[in-house]
Amino acid sequence: MSSDVKDSSHLEKQNSQEYSNSKQNGEIDIMEMLPQKKMYIIEKQFDQSGKGLKIDEFVRVMLTHLDFDKSDVQKEDQITLALIDLFKEIDVNGDGTMEWEEFSDHIISLGLLRNDRSFKNVIKNYFPSEHIKDNQKHETPIEKIVYFDKLKYLVVLEKDSTRFKVYNANTAELYYEVNAHKCAVLDAEYIPDQNLIATSSNDLTINFWDSSFFIPKQIVSVPEIQLCMRYAKWSTQSQPTYLYTGGSDSIIHIYDTKTLKEKGTIGGWNPFFKRDSQQYGHASPIGDILPINIQTTLVTAGLDANICLWDAATHLPKKELRGHEKGVYSLDWSDFSPMNQCLLSAGLDHEAFVWNTYVKEKIFLLRGHNHPLIGVKCLPGTPQVITADINGMVKVWDVRNFLCMQTINVPTDELNSFVVTSNQKKRIIFGARRLYYYEYDEPKDQMLTDEKMCLRVLYNSVLLCLITLHPDCIKVWDIRTGKLQSVYRELSTAELTVCVLDTRKRKLFVGDADGNIFTVNIKNGAKMKKFEKHNNRMITDLTHWTSKKPATIEIGGDDDDEDGTGDSRRVVSCSREETVFIHDEDSSDPSRSCRYKMKQHKSSVNSLSLKQDSELFASASDDGNIVITNLNSYRQETLPSTQYPFEKKKVIFLDPYNALVTSDSEGYVHFYCVNNGKARTRYLLTKKYETTSVVNNKVDKFPVTHLAFNSDNNMLLLSDELGNVTIWDLTIFLKKLDEIKDDNIQQQKTKQAQTPLKQTPNRASNGFFPTELDELKQINEKQISLSQMDNLEKYFQDKDIAFVHQLKGAHNDGITWIEVLKEYNMFATSSFDCCCHLWSFNDYKKMGSLILGHDIMNNNWQLRVDEEKRKVDAQYYMEKLKKKLNKDDQSDDEEKNSQKQDESMMSDKNFDQKNQKKPKKTEKGEKGEKAPEKPLPEKKKVLTAQEKMEQNKKLKNELKLEFDPALLNLNKNKKQVLSEKEQIEKASELLEKVKKFNDVIANKNKDRRNPLEIDYDDFLRAYQMDEQVDIYLDQNEEEEEDNNILYDLDDPKNQSIPAGAYTSKGAFKSKNIGRKNKI
């Protein structure tokens, strides 16, 4: 019998309601909404950021490109929450950003899951029913089976028989045998609104029978043999109910179920009849008819290999699907979820076709049969598709990935028909010489967590689930209901042995019996990364360490510490060998992931424990030693030996205290004080773990199988191989531990810094040093402290650890793991007895169990989650994110409007400057007299003032655009950058003032042959250099009034400046120009 158990059947019972429930809960499937045509645009948005998108940037990009009604605020909020969850799901490593490679890899991984057997909710195996047998005699082979779900009837039609038999579908009990027609019965259909069963025959009649007592109600004559029939109740406005029949004349007839009269044939015309002038229709006998109510579409298949789609309201043709080479006589519709809706067809071809009704091409072929198929069926509410051929080969497919999950060979020479039932058992019933029943493999005990032992149970506070580890699978359970959510199978070829959560609780690190280590995504079961393999030795324990706490994703945060970058992430593994591997989680090469191999032990390493918020981990070995290792320096320290040199099986840090507990193979529990830094680790106490033996009913010590600590109430939980759980109270022990004066240098400095001023030693009134009395007190305190340190074994006593309670017989076999759920004040246990239970710290009563049975109400699951608080937190986070997005959008809009205004002003200014009339400049100024031209020197060409000014005017527009906003800053104390509009205005003012100044100088020097030539390019460069020095080098200098040179250049007519003052570049390096009194 298969090891797959009732878990999947329970899953599939829920799957049909998953989509509707998710809609009611407001969950959105982002991947379903993702437009493939916009993927290239989205990729560009990722590339522009350079370092990836933060969560607010990611949400903005996705909200822009997702297909939904942007005016629907409620829909936008739901999508925003879904995008936040998606970001956290993809950002498994927690670096706070998402690059395009991560996003695209996530999408690809969803597709790869179609080819991965570890995909969740794996279909269960079928096996022949041991309880249901067909004991009836069949004179001829069974030609066809028809199942009526509402009646739970199975109508059996035998080859060339005028009778039909009615069975109880659940028990195979024969109810009726009806003498129905004069010739062979071909098909049967149930009409629920009239409580009738219709049968068709070779005698050219359709008979209608009362479904309760099979009394004939009406006989309808037909012109041709009707090979198939199908009832349909359409969800259109009038909600008509029809009986469709397909004849050997390739015509489809319509009958009104209320009047049982034919409808749709008027004057010999039938819309389904294919004429030479028509493009659609059938030219051969009809093989099958299928109404798809959700699409108001009628699908017909014929022996001409065509599949036709018709509008349900008008019965006009919609589409024709071509691809089959031979006749088609079986159709079915899969509606497992909106993402998996598809049409399936089968016939004389050896493959079943999968269609999307919106396109004409097939989307997949279900291959694997070597003979013509007899049909294709979908199990309602499940992802299962069944195909069978005439040779008796049956295949079970998963419609989510189109993989063949199981192959069944029915023991018969020729298989003719089969049906599937929608009851709890999901039976498949085959018709050959007799009926063959196949059903799900059911566990004998439905109160189990799995048919195989439960090795670990872990609590995930982020995803609100419990995770159980079994030798061949990992199961995920909803913490709110105790129901099974997902099953991940075939993760490894070897048996799974250990697993541990990462610090962000988004993935699992898993080890197996062959020494393999890999990570699994908890959300979808995808295997993500492998690590260096141990030498074919079973992995005994794993732990995960991050150099700092998991970063919370801040909205728009720029702190490097918040994005998670620069973290050191390590995976520590041990196995049935003496070496402990320290892996680099970020290593890209699995074969070289190990950064360090710790070989301090001399035998098998059994257990690991990480001290939270530190760099230390402890390892316990069969050599009797406990080794403390620093994950950064790899410094190692072996704990002091005790008088009990037995094999160490378990080790645990009592976080947040500086204490460690270990158990050995003889039932002794040892307590140590562990100090950080260079201080020594000290042995404190040993206590025996005792319980009552089942064999002789005597109290004796037993090995401890697992240790767990609850820091909220200082309770230590211990389990044994008898299935008991014992609780010890460590309050007194931990109080004494705090009283010990720690000689750690760093902790001494911290304590001294926190010492109140009134507790400091008294100082002499005339000096700095303490008095002699103070020194004696300090010496005495040190002596007491040292005395305590030397006699710690006497200071700590057995009575410091108080017995609280023992759960006798919590399990029927040895307990493998204890998981503390602090926020609910509960703990969970797993065992070799294949069970997992939940317990309360208040009264130590069972609060529920993780079970396979369908009836979860009997489980009495009592854990309650504060959903409102989680919703409020999610809503607050979303509102905060939306405010950030709105603020950024407003800034973008203002910047765009400013750019448009600047571009408009630049255009207007350029137009005015080009059309402005410029007066001719002469040597005599405004009189207009021409000056004699003087030839330029031959050696060096010198431009005249007029030519120079014309050249500078041509550069005017370019200079305006080259101005740096920081160089025109008029208030350097505030360090505000001018807008582009102010840039252009100030640049224009500067050039106009320089132009006026040039005119003044030229007029004052009109007696000279050549006017003063001002190099405007040099002027502006010198000006820019001056401003750069002020802004960037002296930005911390505080000045009362530090005005730009632009304000120092008042109207040149009101200044008395000697000629030649601006003839050198160095003249402009002085920022402040003294003003003279007005003339």
Swiss-Prot record:
PROSITE patterns: EF_HAND_1 (PS00018), EF_HAND_2 (PS50222), WD_REPEATS_1 (PS00678), WD_REPEATS_2 (PS50082), WD_REPEATS_REGION (PS50294). Ca(2+) binds at residues 91, 93, 95, 97, 102. Residues 1-27, 883-943 are annotated as: Disordered. WD repeats lie at residues 137-177, 180-219, 224-265, 281-320, 323-365, 368-407, 449-487, 600-639, 643-682, 699-738, 810-849. Pfam families: WD40 (PF00400). InterPro entries: EF-hand-dom_pair, EF_Hand_1_Ca_BS, EF_hand_dom, WD-EF-hand_domain, WD40/YVTN_repeat-like_dom_sf, WD40_repeat_CS, WD40_repeat_dom_sf, WD40_rpt. Residues 1-15, 922-943 have a biased composition (Basic and acidic residues). One of its GO terms (cellular component) is cilium. Residues 16-25 have a biased composition (Polar residues). Its main location: other. Residues 78-113 form the EF-hand domain. Keywords: Calcium, Cell projection, Repeat, WD repeat. One of its GO terms (molecular function) is calcium ion binding. It is found in: Cell projection, Cilium. Belongs to the CFAP337 family. Associates with components of the nexin-dynein regulatory complex (N-DRC), a key regulator of ciliary/flagellar motility, and might act as an inner dynein arm (IDA) hub or linkage. Associates with components of the nexin-dynein regulatory complex (N-DRC) and the CFAP184:CFAP263 complex. This is Cilia- and flagella-associated protein 337 A. The gene is CFAP337A.
